[in-house]
Amino acid sequence: MNYEKQDNLLNAFKELLAQERFGSQSEIVQALQELGFTQINQSKVSRMLTKFGAVRTRNTRMEMVYCLPNELSVPNTKSPLKNLVLDIDHNHFVVVIRTTPGAAQLIARLLDSIGKADGILGTIAGDDTIFVTPTLDANIADLIKSIRNLFETSI
């Protein structure tokens, strides 16, 4: 699929979810097919729902429907970092960073690029959680301070 078609599909997908009238993935598939996206199937819709952090919620008619909450939108290159980091916590051995859904790998990659010079041995990232392991000589309080400064947050 070329980029223009993919962008058109993603835009149509987002517009459909904004209507808050689709209660099942098969309804979304059917609507996209009616818009001319004939190669769409349930598994592709499922992946897009996951990618964009879609949730099922009740609409104004009290029907369970899929929607894309604004506060859970997928990060992009224009997202300010401080908006992606929700919480930073730690114990004596590891720092745990909670992010918006889909942002953990982006933030972890940034932390990995900073590297050992600032006390970061490595990171492990899921969808919305990052484990940061400090180097042996790193003071955990100093590491927390530098991470918070990086994300301009006082969490």
Swiss-Prot record:
Keywords annotated in UniProt:
Amino-acid biosynthesis, Arginine biosynthesis, Cytoplasm, DNA-binding, Repressor, Transcription, Transcription regulation
- Name the InterPro entries for this protein: Arg_repress, Arg_repress_C, Arg_repress_C_sf, Arg_repress_DNA-bd, WH-like_DNA-bd_sf, WH_DNA-bd_sf
Report the GO terms under cellular component: cytoplasm
Q: Which residues form a coiled coil?
A: none
Major subcellular site: cytoplasm
Q: Where in the cell is it found?
A: Cytoplasm
- Can the keyword Nucleus be found in this entry's annotation? no
Specify the pathway: Amino-acid biosynthesis; L-arginine biosynthesis [regulation]
In Gene Ontology terms, what is a biological process of this protein? L-arginine biosynthetic process
Q: Name one GO molecular function term.
A: DNA binding
**Pfam families with a match to the protein in the record:** Arg_repressor, Arg_repressor_C
Q: Which HAMAP family match?
A: Arg_repressor
What PANTHER family does this protein map onto? ARGININE REPRESSOR
Known function? Regulates arginine biosynthesis genes.
Record family assignment: Belongs to the ArgR family.
Put simply, this protein is called Arginine repressor
